[in-house]
Amino acid sequence: MPFLMIRNDITKVAADAIVNPANRNLLQGSGTSRAIYQAAGEQELTAACEAIGHCEPGRAVCTPAFGLPAKYIFHAVCPAWHGGFFGEAKQLAGAYHSALELAAEYHCESVAFPLLSSGNYGYPKEQAFRIAVDTITQYVMEHDLTVYLVLYDRGSLAVSRKLFTSVEEYIDDHYVAQNDESYQFGRRRREYVERWEDAALADREYPAQECAPPVFAAAPPPPAAAPMAARSLENLMDNLGESFTTRLLRLIDERGLKDSTVYKQSNISRQHFSKIQCNRDYNPKKKTVLAFAVGLHLSEDETIDLLKSAGYAFSDGSKRDWIVRYCLEQKIYNINQVNTLLFEYDQEQLGA
C-alpha cells in the first residue's frame, strides 16, 4: 500500500522497478516497450533478455534496469486481444500479479506499471484498466508496496459515463456557482471603484475628501473595548478540542474496525499510519484526512469534524473538495474510484 495513478513517461518514473509490456520472446516491441529499451540502453537490455530467452503469457521475468532511474525492469508478457474468448483476462491479471510477486522477491518498495495490453495488443482500454486496478488493489491490500499506474491520457480510465456526468453536474452546481458568485462580487466592486475614480477626476475643484463616497468618510472613533478576562496559555491549552489522532483512533474503535483495515481502505501505508498513531499532536496533510474519511465511510458532517480536528475545512474554491463531498453524499467509499475521479479532473489524489 498505497496505489496511485500518475500521468507521466514511465521511463522517467523514479521507482525501484518499472514494468515493460513484453512479448513471449522478450524482443523489443513498439510504443512503451521501445521507449523502455531506448532509455535503458538497447544493447545491454537486449543481451539481458536474450540470456533469458522466453516467457509465457501471464508471467514476468526480471532484468537490471541499466540506464533507467530504477533498479529492475520486470518484463510482463501480455496477452493480445482476441475478443475475450481465449482467457485474455486471466492472462492479463496474471501478468500484473507475476510482476508484483517479483517486486516482493526483489524487496522492492515501489513499482510502476504502464496500462498493460492496452496499446498494440488491442485490449479495450476500459477493460484493461479495470483488470489493472482490481489486481493491484487486491495485492496491495496484503503487501507493503507502493504501486504506480502510469497513464498517458484520460482515455484509459474506466469512469462510467453516468457517474462522470453526475459529477460534472455536481461541480457545475457547486464549485462553478461559488466561483461565479465571487467573480460577480469582484466585478461589481471594480465597477464601483471605477465610477468613483471617474467622478473624482471629472471635478478637480473639490478636495478629494468631498469626492469620496460615504464609505470613506470620517467615522467616529470606535467605543473602547470591554476588558478581556485574563486567560493563561495553560488555560487555552487545557480547552483545546480533540486532536486529529485522538479523533481518528476513536472513530476506528467506535466502528469496531482493525487499524489495518482502515489504513488500507484509506490508501495509507502502514508506516504512515504508525507515525500518526504514535503522535497525539500529529499534523496531517488535508489529503490524508480526506482519505481517512473515505476509508472510515464517514458522512459529510463527520468529515467536517475530522477536518476541523486537523485545522482544515472544506473549501468552496477547491474542485477536489467538491468531488470528495460528492462521493461522501453518494456513499462512494471505494478509495480507488474516488482517486480515479480526482485523476480525471487533474486533482491531487487521496492517501499517500
Placement of each model-derived feature along the sequence:
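Short, basic-rich loop-to-helix N-cap that marks the start of a DNA-contacting helix
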Residues: 280-294
